[in-house]
Amino acid sequence: MSMSKLLSPPPTSPPGPALSRLPCRRVAPPPVLPFPFPLRRLTSRRVFATSCSSSDSEHAPSASSTALAGAGDDLSAGVTQEREGALPFVQLSSGIVLRTEEQSLLGDHAPAPAPASAASSFALLDELNGGCREDDHLGETPAYPAAMNALYAACLAGNATEQLWNFTWPAAVAVLHPASILPVAVLGFFTKLVVFAAGPLVGELISSLPRIPAYRSLAAIQTAAHLVSVATITYAFAVHRAAAASLLLRPWFAVLVASTAVDRLACVALGIIAERDFVVQLAGAGRPVALAKANATLSRVDLLCETVGASIFALLLSKNNPLTCIKLSCVISLCALPLLIFLCGEMNRLADGIFDHSENTTSHAEKTSSFSIRKTVEEAVATVRNGWSEYMRQPVLPASLAYVFVCFNVALAPGALMTTFLIHQGVRPSVIGAFGGSSGAVGILATFATARLVKELGILKAGAAGLIAQSALLGAAVVVYLTGAVSRRAGALFAFLGLIVASRAGHMAYSAIGLQVVQTGNPASKAKLIGATEIAVASLAELAMMAVAVVASDASHFGALAALSATAVTAAAGMYCRWLANPSDELRRIFPS
């Protein structure tokens, strides 16, 4: 088919004398033409609407007019001759509608546009392709890319010290009483209790404070809590060791509980600021692809820190006793604090100072002007009640509750209880470090695979796939443990640990996907309050499991904790899949795909 035939009037237009062509002249159309779209007055030089989510192959022009015409139904182009004072438009089925400006807008002395040639048509299509790719690039780029890199560096510095600390303190406490997991379980119980009770308050408090000073202060508080914990554990090693039950009644243990709770609370607050505020603001409004990439990068940073922390812990423990390891961990925290403070300020500078003020400075000033203890307590209770109310009303509540159920898994995951269990089993430090490091490495790989999983299945179904995979692998790990071969054969122990490591892929996939589901389903004004309440509910789940661990204080009861952990993850997968099987209208609106 020739280009002249392609540019001929539509077959629905009746032929007649009025349509006869004259050289270099415009022709007038018949009085009525069946336009597929109403003609509207244009105010811009070139207005086009395009679906930039389509692949480049859908928008790329053909190399010849024959290829362009051969597109058939996939390229239904209707070119109509213009009315007096209106230029033609080209309708493409790929979603591109190009309209040129009215001749009256060209000026009195502007020459009339010449009829479109094949070369000019291709040039227009090339320009549209370039605009689509430019829009894609803008949607994938954060609003403040340099500041986002500074945020990644700050999270790297903070998470590295935190992950190393999370390995060293359980090992040191476990050595205080090698025959029982009770001290570690009690510390975990009270830590989760404090986070559960104060989580919504923390979310409200950090919303009323300038973000940069609050972030720096929390980092300093966390480091101070590490110092107090190290001093307390050092004192505990110096005094005469007692039975596990009487050890809990010592004054130094109460101080250790308080410092550990403060450390965890500061960690939660830092995470809320970084994941629910900083990353959202730096990604920019209306840039979901940039936000998704930023969330994935933060997950990789956290997992990289987990891998590095476990490796450093294994190296330190192989050459030193647990007390020396925890002292070195505290020194690393002290060294990282100045770097963290600097990177936080640098991030704000690169973001043009968007974090200089709190989000609600007026209400905060009103609160501080009329301070009273009774009013403060009433406001705290109201904040907690409001946080729970907003959390229960969120449209993506099942996705958040599935994450809470996953948090019941405190036994079959790298953490305090698993580290204590492995030490009691007499496992070598290199194996403990390899377990933690490989768990982080698998998580990092999962963040890359998650993007493809979301592309193939969609974000909601990809979350279900992650939960199902995690529940299946943890169930297999429990079966291996309950056979009783873990304590007798090294092969069974490695199989048990290997299944847990593999389950981290599903865990991290749902962690990344669930975070974006909750971010997308809730307005920005309520993000930190709902996020803090979600963490409080998750701490309640961990609190319940730690209470079970306190009751089953003997290491021989670890199998019961493992079975409960696997059951909770299975329940999370079932609840999430049921939610997807019966979607509400609100869910279809938020996630139309």
Curated annotation (Swiss-Prot):
Localization per Swiss-Prot or TrEMBL: Membrane; Plastid, Chloroplast envelope
Any one GO CC term of the record: membrane
Alphabetized InterPro entries for the sequence: Ferroportin-1 (IPR009716), MFS_trans_sf (IPR036259)
Keyword match Lyase: no
Keywords: Chloroplast, Ion transport, Membrane, Plastid, Transit peptide, Transmembrane, Transmembrane helix, Transport
Biased composition (Pro residues): 8-17
Membrane-crossing segments per the record: 181-201, 219-239, 253-273, 303-322, 323-343, 403-423, 431-451, 462-482, 493-513, 530-550, 557-577
S-adenosyl-L-methionine is among the record's keywords: no
FT transit peptide: 1-51
GO BP field: iron ion transport
Family of this protein: Belongs to the ferroportin (FP) (TC 2.A.100) family. SLC40A subfamily.
Function: May be involved in iron transport and iron homeostasis.
The protein, known as: Solute carrier family 40 member 3, chloroplastic
Top-level taxonomy: Eukaryota, Viridiplantae, Streptophyta, Embryophyta, Tracheophyta
